[in-house]
Structures are given as C-alpha cells and as structure tokens.
From Swiss-Prot:
Positions of region (Disordered): 600-633
Protein name (database record): Chaperone protein DnaK
UniProt function note: Acts as a chaperone.
CDD domains for the chain: ASKHA_NBD_HSP70_DnaK-like (cd10234)
Record lineage: Bacteria, Pseudomonadati, Pseudomonadota, Gammaproteobacteria, Pasteurellales
Origin species: Glaesserella parasuis serovar 5 (strain SH0165) (Haemophilus parasuis)
Length: 633
C-alpha cells in the first residue's frame, strides 16, 4: 500500500508532508521551498503553478488566479463573493448552477478545477520525494467550512487524481502536530488559526493515557472570509488612496499597476512584522500627459496596525463563542497555538496574548503545522501510526425546515463526528401525499436565515389527517463532516435519501470530465517535456558535430563534409518544429551521415598518437642536453 500524504491546501500557500518512518516530514518542492504559493497562471502555452506563476503575475494579472479557496463551494450571490469581485484582478463569473466560477481566456472554470492544479503540484512533489506514485491524501480545510465547501475540496482532490481519504479541520491538524512533541498528561489547547483567507478557533482537549493520545475537539468557531488577504487589501487601498491624493491618478483602473501594488503591500506587511517602518517604492507605476509617476511612500507599523486593528478584533469574537460553547473560561486554557502566516504580525500576537492572559507558543511553525498534522492523520489511516485518536466535530448545527419557516435542529454544532441522529415529524395538512425535506445548516431560528444544503421529496404517503403520518428524518455525518439525509414513512416503509451536494456543487459527470481534462493535460505536458528533451538532444548533437567537422579539417573529404553539414541543417530546422518523431529521424540521419567524420576522427587520433610518441623521443634528447648544461654551471 502506498503512502497517504497530508496536504494543507491554503489560500495563500500550500504545503505537503508525509510520514517518514515514525516522524512526519515536510517535503520541499521542485523550487526547493517548503511551501508553494497557491497561485495558478494560464499562459498561451502552459499552466504555471506556485512560484513560476507568482513571478509572472504583474504582466499577466487577468489570467493569474490566487485566493481561489475563498470562492470554493460558494454561490455567486454570496456577499463575500460580491466583495471579492470588486478587488480581484481576474473575472469572477456566475456558473449555470449559481456557483461562483472564474473566467479565464473566455473559458469558465470551477474553483475545484483550479485548486486541483495546486493539488497536482503537491502530489508531484510527494512522488518525486518518495519515488513512487501517490494516489491517496488527507486534505485540510478550515474548521468553519460548510458542507458545500468540504464537498468542493474533495472534488478538487478527485480532479487532481487523488482519493481523499479524509478531510480534517486545520486547527485540529495543527493540534496533532503540536501534540506529537508535547508529553504533558492532559491539557486543553486553543488553536488560533489566521491564514491567508480564513480564520478558525478550536478548543481541543489532548489526553495522554498509557502512551496513547486522544485529540478531542471541544468546540470550534470561525470566519471563512477573514485572513491575510483582507489585511493586504487594507494596505493596498491605503497606498492607492494616498497616491491618488498626491498624483490625482486612480490606479484601480490599471490591473498591471494594481498587481505591482499588491506585491509591494504584501512585502511591506511582512517587513513590518520585524521593522518599525518600511518604504514602498514603485517607480514608473503609471504615466499621464505630464510624464511618468512614481509611488514612493513610507509606511509605519503603527499605520498598518491602525488600518487592520478592527480585523484583529473581529477575529476575537469567534474565540469568545468557542469558549462559551466548550463551557470553559480563559484560565482553563493551558496553551495557545498560533497557526497561519498572518499570526506573525506583532499586533495579532499581542491581542491574542492579552485575551488569553498568556503568551502563545512560539515552537510551532505556523506555515507547516497543518500539513504535518494531516500527514499524521494519513499515517493513522494507513495503519502506520497507532497511538493517536482524533475526535473532530461538526462546526455548524444541522436541521430541516418545519412549519412556519422555522429551522428544527437535529444535530447541534460541536457534536463529535461521525454521528447519526433521527427524529420523527409529521404532515402539516390533511391527506398530504408528499413532504419536502429542506436541509439547513446554521444557527438561526428562521429557516431562510440559514444556509440551504438542498432538498428532496418523500412521496406516496397514505392519505391521513394532519399529524398522523410518522416520517422519520435521519441525519448521518461521516468522519469528513459530509452529510447524508434520509426520510422514511414508518407506515409504508417508503424511504428517500440524498447525499447532500447542496443546491450547487459539481455533478459527478462534471467532475469526471474535469478528471479526463486533467489527465489529457498531464499527457500533453508529458509529450511537451519529451519534445523539449528531444530538442535539447538535437541541439547538443548538432553543436558537437559542427565542432568535430572543424577539428577534422583536411582529414574529412569535401563531399562528406557537405553531406554532414546538410544533415546538421536539416536537424536544426526539424528541432524548431513540434514533431518529435521527425527530430528523432533527423538525429538518426545525422548519425548515419557522420560515419566518415568518425573515421576521420579516428585517423586524426592515430596521427596524434604517432606525433606524441615521436615528441616523447625528442623530449628525452632535450632533457639530456638540459642536464649537461646545468652541470656545466
């Protein structure tokens, strides 16, 4: 059985790890980095992922996609998506099923399809390290991800050629990574996870009993649209507004300029975690009739903190809710673990320390902990790790719409999963022959204020007065947090069930098509790589042959020389084309035409040998004479 890898599919960066013996190990990518930017770029010739995509973003802003995780499993009409439409340089569009998709070069693409490109890079990184194919993975998601977002993440894995063995929550994964190194008996930890696009807070109880560790999530809360991207956007807006005040030019209309500002803002934000001030210097950012304009502005740490303080405060609200749900006070938290790159900001660290009354742990790598935890869970599922038990929870309450437009909850939030719960309902009218089961996720009393996950009908109910039929509704949540709902008429035994895929999401047929497209692209990529290798081989042979012709000199007959040069020219011409077989044929033709050159080379080598032997004899005489001269002195 192959290894089950752990992947942290992040908004800004992604990371892959695997169990190496009994220890989890983060794997470096082809560029030598331990994390990979979650950036995908589509050019005329190829799809770029990670650092290569990031490098060309300034010149290709409309086809360079980032923070796609903020769109995954979301409806186009969601307020968060509408906010992103205003600030993203690429085009967010409405899919036929109402989902938020992206338009690239006139083609509509689903977020899982785009995220699959990052997962494919993670898969390849692991395969290069392990030296064997990888087909299974544990992928992490924010704890507060909805069912639709979890389904979409699984779909992305499937498109990338991975069987997703488990979806686990990011804070839980981070706690797994922390718990491996912690030998304390029993403790309660708070994982504060502020990443590139999402925020989670989980309260986790870690029990050590006879060498076995149990990780039980007591409560979780969060905001799936709060993260480093929002911090960046505050600084971007400030830079753009200051430039407009000074120069009278609005850079928001220039996507290339905005991409430069975005990069500079991200860099400045990172620098201000260690410095008190930094200079943003973007020469020739734009030009008007008066000439070129430069953006030069000093940003202090205090200014950045003033711009984002409300965002940090916003992150503390879910912390309060999670503590209340867990029935714990701040003083009962033994350790606070910071996860996600944005937690490197001193203001975030200070606010968290002030809230909990203790300094957060600094010995957990915020960029790698989640992937490490995912790898540990992969080890558990593969049977390689036997002393760890993970008990996660469902982040939001689940129920159905009942009479009067009310949500009746069947499974409360923070219930340990997997779980199953049934409840009996009845009809609202006399002789009602069918009921619609409308499945909801959320905490509000009014059904319409919660997220609709889908609906289905149970038909064929025998005519009876209202309130008489017995309809049993069952919710079943698996270990991935994915939901199945069934309704059964207890009188007739008729049953109807659905695996929730929300009213949106990708159909099986669409996923299969995307898998086929991905496989076709992989085949095209392989063929392109082989073509490049053949071209390089052709170039090396042509260069080597020309060099040999020059060295052969008069040892090569003019007629032979002309034939070989003709074969070299034919090969160089073929190498500029796209036909690998033609290049290979021309290489073969050149090798055949070069036979006289090989003979000339051998003749020249023999000649050289004879000259060397003669020279050695001569050298002996000279040495003797030299010695005699030396003696005379």
């Amino acid at each position: 059985m192959g290894k089950i890898i752990g992947i942290d599919l992040g908004t800004t960066n992604s990371c892959v790890a695997v169990m190496d013996g009994d220890k989890p190990r983060v794997i470096e990518n082809a560029e030598g980095a331990r994390t990979t930017p979650s950036i995908i770029a589509y050019t005329d010739k190829e799809t770029l992922v990670g650092q290569p995509a990031k490098r060309q973003a300034i010149t290709n802003p409309k086809n360079t996609l980032f923070a796609i995780k903020r769109l995954i499993g979301r409806r186009f009409t969601d307020s968060e998506v509408q906010r992103d439409i205003e600030i993203m340089p690429f085009e967010i569009t409405k899919a036929d099923n109402g989902d938020a998709w992206v338009s690239v070069k006139g083609e509509k693409m689903a977020p899982p399809q785009i995220s699959a490109e990052v997962l494919k890079k993670m898969k390849k990184t692991a395969e290069d390290f392990l030296g064997e194919p990888v087909t299974e993975a544990v992928i992490t998601v924010p704890a507060y991800f909805s069912d639709a977002q979890r389904q979409a993440t699984k779909d992305a894995g499937r498109i990338a050629g991975l069987e997703v063995k488990r979806i686990i929550n990011e804070p839980t994964a981070a706690a797994l990574a922390y718990g491996l190194d912690s030998k304390k008996e029993n403790q309660i930890v708070a994982v504060y996870d502020l990443g590139g696009g999402t925020f989670d807070l989980s309260i986790i109880e870690i029990d050590n009993l006879d060498g076995e560790q149990t990780f039980e999530v007591r409560a979780t809360n969060g905001d799936t649209h709060l993260g480093g991207e929002d911090f960046d956007n505050r600084l971007i807006n400030y830079l753009v507004e200051e430039f407009q005040k000074e120069q009278g030019v609005d850079l928001r209309n220039d996507s290339m300029a905005m991409q430069r500002v975005k990069e500079a803002a991200e860099k400045a934000k990172i620098e201000l975690s260690s410095a008190q001030s930094t200079e943003v210097n973007l020469p020739y950012i734009t030009a008007d009739a008066t000439g070129p304009k430069h953006l030069v502005l000093t940003v202090t740490r205090a200014k950045l903190e003033a711009l984002v303080e409300d965002l940090v405060n916003r992150s503390l609200e879910p912390v309060k809710v999670a503590l209340a749900d867990a029935g714990l006070s701040v003083s009962e938290i033994n350790d606070v673990i910071l996860v996600g790159g944005q937690t490197r900001m001193p203001l975030v660290q200070k606010k968290v320390a002030d809230f909990f009354g203790k300094e957060p742990r600094k010995d957990v790598n915020p960029d790698e902990a989640v992937a490490i935890g995912a790898a540990v869970q992969g080890g558990v599922l593969a049977g390689d790790v036997t002393d760890v038990l993970l008990l996660d929870v469902t982040p939001l309450s689940l129920g159905i719409e009942t009479m009067g437009g009310v949500m009746t909850t069947l499974i409360e939030k923070n219930t340990t999963i997997p779980t199953k719960k049934s409840q009996v309902f009845s009809t609202a009218e006399d002789n009602q022959s069918a009921v619609t089961i409308h499945v909801l996720q959320g905490e509000r009393k009014r059904a319409s204020d919660n997220k609709s996950l889908g609906q289905f009908n149970l038909e064929g109910i025998n005519p009876a007065p209202r309130g008489m039929p017995q309809i049993e509704v069952t919710f079943d949540i698996d270990a991935n947090g994915i939901i199945n709902v069934s309704a059964k008429d207890k009188n007739t035994g008729k049953e109807q069930q659905i695996k929730i895929q929300a009213s949106s999401g990708l159909s099986d047929a669409e996923i299969e098509q995307m898998v086929r497209d991905a496989e076709a692209n992989a085949e095209a990529d392989r063929k392109f790589e082989e073509l490049v290798q053949t071209r390089n081989q052709a170039d090396a042979i042509a260069h080597s042959t020309r060099k040999q012709i020059a060295e052969a000199g008069s040892n090569l007959a003019d007629a032979d020389k002309a034939k070989i040069e003709e074969a070299v020219a034919a090969l160089e011409k073929a190498a500029k084309g796209e036909d690998k077989a033609d290049i290979e044929a021309k290489i073969e033709a050149l090798v055949k035409a070069s036979e006289p050159l090989i003979q000339a080379g051998q003749a020249q080598a023999q000649q050289g040998q004879q000259q060397a032997q003669q020279s050695q004899k001569d050298d002996g005489v000279v040495d003797a004479e030299f010695e005699e001269v030396k003696d005379n002195k």
